[in-house]
Amino acid sequence: MKRLHYAWIIVSVTFLILLAVQGVRLSFGAFVEPWERQFSIDRSTISLISTVSFIVYGISQPVIGRLVDKWGARAVLAWSALLTGVSIFLTYLVTSPWQLFLLYGLGVSLGVGGASNVAASVLVVNWFSKKRGLAFGIMEAGFGAGQMLLVPGSLMLIHWFSWKLTVVVLGLLLIVIVFPAALLMLRNNPSEKNTEPIGGLAASEKETAPKTTALSVAGMFRMRQFWFLIFPFLICGFTTVGLMDTHLIPFSHDHGFSTTVTSAAVSLLAGFNIAGILLSGIVADRWSSRKILCILYAVRALSIVILIYSHEPYLLLAFAILFGLVDFATVAPTQMLATQYFQNYSIGLMIGWLSLAHQIGSALGAYVPGVIYTVTGEYTLAFYLSIGMLVLASVMNVMLREPAAVTRDSAAVVDK
């Protein structure tokens, strides 16, 4: 029997880390109403906590990319998971809103920022020369699995017991299970296990060697491809983690849907999110990532149209299925394009900039709809704003050139 390559252990452990850490982050919406009642604060204030969290997360991403280059992805992922666990556990002791800003807005967010796809993506690149799109898909499926398990799980624990017991359970999951698994099982490079990456050593060395280029980082900012990846990914953050992960549960309750229906919708969304992530990763190995992204953003806009008219449970569930299929499915194609367009740059640094853009979008997507809700008493205007932004993101991906053409042009410039 052929022995399982350790690369699959690596991607499985990163899946577990993202499931737990990002699942904690994605569960924020479950705590919105309990915290409103507990601390007598309005929706916009709760949204501001989420916004601060996204800003801290986002600002940390380029720094995390540098830390991964310096200390290795294993250390960054493991200790970040521990920081997230300790911070969410300590929210049990919170007695006023400023403490939530400190523990969740700062502590949890720094931990989540470290245990993100910046460090995890570096592991995938180091361990996979081939089947990289599939590996990215499996890794990113951790987001969907965390959403499917921890968000409805948090909802039910809050419903049956209390939000304080829920944060204790989430904290112990990270401290007792995830942190030891990351520390004991992750390895930064195949050489640490006396093996080669999937696809061969030569290809991996070419991809992961220290990046040297005549172009400055400022030159990267002047590249059209940089901004045409960054801005749609900002819109991605606005419409997924910002808008839906913060406001979908309150929206559902405002429309009179029960906790059972809301949990079913969240679970369906997360389940189809996993399917969409895996499918997009597989397709990204075989087809144009640029065209995939164009389709994904357009379908996401269509799903929000359905949500606007979701006055019956079956429409809410239909939205959940369609939105789930395209939720985090944008990540693998975006990362594939980034590694193809910017081959001369640090992988961790480039993914860090993408993640920063995503978190800026997430921060705006959490706060702006909260303000709109406070002013108008509904989310309709926020949904129409999101639809317009998604159409723009789809068009911007149409306007991108294929990576092969960009690489040929860059090579021609170097030859001259």
Curated annotation (Swiss-Prot):
<feature type="transmembrane region" description="Helical">
    <location>
        <begin position="347"/>
        <end position="367"/>
    </location>
</feature>
<dbReference type="InterPro" id="IPR050327">
    <property type="entry name" value="Proton-linked_MCT"/>
</dbReference>
<feature type="transmembrane region" description="Helical">
    <location>
        <begin position="75"/>
        <end position="95"/>
    </location>
</feature>
<feature type="transmembrane region" description="Helical">
    <location>
        <begin position="4"/>
        <end position="24"/>
    </location>
</feature>
<keyword id="KW-1133">Transmembrane helix</keyword>
<keyword id="KW-0472">Membrane</keyword>
<keyword id="KW-0812">Transmembrane</keyword>
<feature type="transmembrane region" description="Helical">
    <location>
        <begin position="380"/>
        <end position="400"/>
    </location>
</feature>
<keyword id="KW-1003">Cell membrane</keyword>
<comment type="similarity">
    <text>Belongs to the major facilitator superfamily.</text>
</comment>
<keyword id="KW-0813">Transport</keyword>
<dbReference type="GO" id="GO:0005886">
    <property type="term" value="C:plasma membrane"/>
</dbReference>
<feature type="transmembrane region" description="Helical">
    <location>
        <begin position="264"/>
        <end position="284"/>
    </location>
</feature>
<feature type="transmembrane region" description="Helical">
    <location>
        <begin position="304"/>
        <end position="324"/>
    </location>
</feature>
<dbReference type="InterPro" id="IPR011701">
    <property type="entry name" value="MFS"/>
</dbReference>
<dbReference type="InterPro" id="IPR036259">
    <property type="entry name" value="MFS_trans_sf"/>
</dbReference>
<feature type="transmembrane region" description="Helical">
    <location>
        <begin position="226"/>
        <end position="246"/>
    </location>
</feature>
<dbReference type="GO" id="GO:0022857">
    <property type="term" value="F:transmembrane transporter activity"/>
</dbReference>
<feature type="transmembrane region" description="Helical">
    <location>
        <begin position="141"/>
        <end position="161"/>
    </location>
</feature>
<protein>
    <recommendedName>
        <fullName>Uncharacterized MFS-type transporter YbfB</fullName>
    </recommendedName>
</protein>
<feature type="transmembrane region" description="Helical">
    <location>
        <begin position="100"/>
        <end position="120"/>
    </location>
</feature>
<feature type="transmembrane region" description="Helical">
    <location>
        <begin position="165"/>
        <end position="185"/>
    </location>
</feature>
<feature type="transmembrane region" description="Helical">
    <location>
        <begin position="45"/>
        <end position="65"/>
    </location>
</feature>
<dbReference type="Pfam" id="PF07690">
    <property type="entry name" value="MFS_1"/>
</dbReference>
<dbReference type="InterPro" id="IPR020846">
    <property type="entry name" value="MFS_dom"/>
</dbReference>
